[in-house]
């Protein structure tokens, strides 16, 4: 018995493409930019649609304290501040590929948050 050629090509299973947002936060700008560049380079090697890095406004946390522990003496103050930098990267790809991209070595002090939504 011979098989008939119907002219149809075999149907490949559709891979669900998600909109993936990667949020990076850090106190150190150099390490944050290095991780951003590594993520984007990995995504471009896989021919993914990339938007970003979007530089969000820097949050500056300030604390002002009196220098003397007892409150006596001259009124001198210490001012401390911590700057938190944030970057957003948007990808359009299947979630399996994102697992491969985000498996790169991430600098210490950089926090990574991955949010997946349907495209």
From Swiss-Prot:
UniProt GO cellular component terms: cytosolic ribosome; small ribosomal subunit
Coiled coil: none
Cross-link for Glycyl lysine isopeptide (Lys-Gly) (interchain with G-Cter in ubiquitin), residue positions: 4, 8
InterPro entries found in the cross-reference section: Ribosomal_uS10, Ribosomal_uS10_CS, Ribosomal_uS10_dom, Ribosomal_uS10_dom_sf, Ribosomal_uS10_euk/arc
Post-translational events: Polyubiquitinated by ZNF598 via 'Lys-63'-linked ubiquitin chains when a ribosome has stalled, initiating the ribosome quality control (RQC) pathway to degrade the potentially detrimental aberrant nascent polypeptide. Deubiquitinated by OTUD3 and USP21, antagonizing ZNF598 activity. Ufmylated by UFL1.
Listed Gene3D superfamilies: Ribosomal protein S10 domain
Binding partners and assembly: Component of the 40S small ribosomal subunit.
Function: Component of the small ribosomal subunit. The ribosome is a large ribonucleoprotein complex responsible for the synthesis of proteins in the cell.
Protein name in the entry: Small ribosomal subunit protein uS10
Biological classification of the source: Eukaryota, Metazoa, Chordata, Craniata, Vertebrata
This protein's encoding gene: RPS20
